[in-house]
Curated annotation (Swiss-Prot):
<dbReference type="GO" id="GO:0033687">
    <property type="term" value="P:osteoblast proliferation"/>
</dbReference>
<keyword id="KW-0238">DNA-binding</keyword>
<dbReference type="GO" id="GO:2001145">
    <property type="term" value="P:negative regulation of phosphatidylinositol-3,4,5-trisphosphate 5-phosphatase activity"/>
</dbReference>
<keyword id="KW-0964">Secreted</keyword>
<dbReference type="GO" id="GO:0003677">
    <property type="term" value="F:DNA binding"/>
</dbReference>
<protein>
    <recommendedName>
        <fullName>Mitochondrial-derived peptide MOTS-c</fullName>
    </recommendedName>
</protein>
<dbReference type="GO" id="GO:0071902">
    <property type="term" value="P:positive regulation of protein serine/threonine kinase activity"/>
</dbReference>
<keyword id="KW-0496">Mitochondrion</keyword>
<dbReference type="GO" id="GO:0006357">
    <property type="term" value="P:regulation of transcription by RNA polymerase II"/>
</dbReference>
<keyword id="KW-0539">Nucleus</keyword>
<dbReference type="GO" id="GO:0032147">
    <property type="term" value="P:activation of protein kinase activity"/>
</dbReference>
<dbReference type="GO" id="GO:0043610">
    <property type="term" value="P:regulation of carbohydrate utilization"/>
</dbReference>
<comment type="function">
    <text>Regulates insulin sensitivity and metabolic homeostasis. Inhibits the folate cycle, thereby reducing de novo purine biosynthesis which leads to the accumulation of the de novo purine synthesis intermediate 5-aminoimidazole-4-carboxamide (AICAR) and the activation of the metabolic regulator 5'-AMP-activated protein kinase (AMPK). Protects against age-dependent and diet-induced insulin resistance as well as diet-induced obesity.</text>
</comment>
<keyword id="KW-0892">Osteogenesis</keyword>
<dbReference type="GO" id="GO:0005634">
    <property type="term" value="C:nucleus"/>
</dbReference>
<dbReference type="Pfam" id="PF21945">
    <property type="entry name" value="MT-RNR1"/>
</dbReference>
<keyword id="KW-0805">Transcription regulation</keyword>
């Protein structure tokens, strides 16, 4: 489980 895939839901602004 990568936080980037599931973390994007919590921190979509950091990835996007």
């Amino acid at each position: 489980m990568r936080w980037q895939e599931m973390g994007y839901i919590f921190y979509p602004r950091k990835l996007r």
